[in-house]
Structures are given as structure tokens and as C-alpha cells.
Amino acid sequence: MTALITQFWQQVETALKTANPQEKCRLVNDLYDNLLPQIQLIKLEDFPEIVPQDNIAAFPEKPLLVAPKDVPKRSFATEEGYAATLHAIAHIEFNAINLGLDAAWRFGRNAQEELGEGLAFVKDWLRVAREESTHFSLVNEHLKTLGYQYGDFEAHAGLWEMAQATAHDIWERMALVPRVLEARGLDATPVLQEKIAQRKDFAAVNILDIILRDEIGHVYIGNHWYHALSKKRGLDAMKCFTELLHKYRIVIFKGVINTDARIQAGFTQHELDWIYEVEQTLKSYIKK
């Protein structure tokens, strides 16, 4: 591993270990814009060897993290409730920065070993982290115009808990974080934009336009690597995905399905129909 590659991975680790949101964003932007273009990751030895229990991602002291059921429900019609909604988006984006960094750091070596495409994998997930840092900054700055900032409301750790649950396997991570958790945002964002437009906060609507556009690309990246890994491992991508949904007791569709966005993000209509049918039985299974 050359000195430049060592410096690169040290900054990836530093960004992951940084709790301050603004400093984390600065480090991520520098990583993607300045360091990444200078390196070539060719050999397996160019990637760090990570074990599943390694977890170095840092989070700020605030927001206070609680169980999803314990996040206070506030009316969207009130200023505080509206700010809490934007805060929830900022929290998702902050977690997504760590998810992009962690994927590159944790699984780059696996992508090189299994597919011979470690550099492409690292570039993809650092691009995700870079764009998520922009999303976080946009939402947090807008939140400040309402008199609030990131950390002012409680939040939950559901997104990161799934990252920890899939820390042992690049294939499971690609299957469940971008294709399930991040893809839900494709469905939810247009509905939320309509509600925000009724408040005439068109700056927030425009921010969500940027987020939706980029998230389509992020889910596409997840789909690409999931299918590449499934093919390499000789797995039936749809059948095995169904088994994962049962294993983790996950329901994907929670309301309106944004079919157009999901297809742009790499799902096929056949796959979406398959998942929908599977979920009808899965919902009954989960209720038992």
C-alpha cells in the first residue's frame, strides 16, 4: 500500500470517526473531490481488511436517539412539527453519509476479492457519501431559517441498526440498505413534497427535488452491486431477496409506490410486482 493510499484510507477512517456534522461533511467532500482522483486501488492489499465487529462510525451527542416508537409525534401543521419533519430528513441524510463511508471502508476489499472491482465500488459509495453530505447541509441550513438546527429533536437509529446487522456481508448490505431503506425515500418524497408545497415552503420542495434525483442514483448503485454479487455467487437475485425479507421481517412498501423512480433506480416492473406479491404474505407472517 503506497503512502498516498494509506493517507486516503486514514482520511476515510477519520471521516467515519468524526461526530461533528460540519467537519464530517468537510472531510467527505475533500476525500471525494481531492484525494480519490489521485489514487489507484488495484491490488487486494490496497484495501483495509475489516471484520464485522469493527464499528468506528461516530454520531454527535445530539440528537438524542430513541426507539422509533418513542420518537414524539408532532403535528405537521405546527411550526415545531414541521421543523421536526425536516429534522428527521436531516437525520436520515447524516446517517447516509456514514453509510456511504462505511460501505467503501468495510466492503471495498470484498468487492475487489469477489468481483475485481474494488476501486469502482469505493468510488460509487464515496460519491454517495459526498452527495449525502450536500443533502444534509442543504436541509440543516434550511432548518436554521426556521429557528432550529440538527440535534434539536429526538431521532431514531433504525437506519444504522440495519447497517450493523449487515456488517458481515457485502451482499446483504447491498440488498437491504440501498434497495430497501433508501428506496423507501423514492416513494415517500413526492408525497412529502406535496404537503410541503401546501405550506408554500418552495425552497424545501426544491431541496427535496435534489435529494430525490440523487437518491435514484444511490439506489441504482445498490441495485447494480446487489445483482453483480448475486450473479458472481450463483444466487437467484429475486428468490434470495425474498428470503432476506423474511429473515429480517422487513416490509418494503409502506404506502404509495413511486414506480417510475424505482425503475429509474434499477428495479424492473417484474421485480416490483414480485416484491408486492411476496409482501402480501409477509405482512400476514409478521402479524403472527
Swiss-Prot record:
Top-level lineage group: Bacteria
Species: Haemophilus influenzae (strain ATCC 51907 / DSM 11121 / KW20 / Rd)
PANTHER family for the chain: DUF455 DOMAIN-CONTAINING PROTEIN, SI:CH73-314G15.3
InterPro entries linked: DUF455, Ferritin-like_SF, UCP012318
Protein name listed in UniProt: Uncharacterized protein HI_0077
Lineage start: Bacteria, Pseudomonadati, Pseudomonadota, Gammaproteobacteria, Pasteurellales
Xref: SUPFAM superfamilies: Ferritin-like (SSF47240)
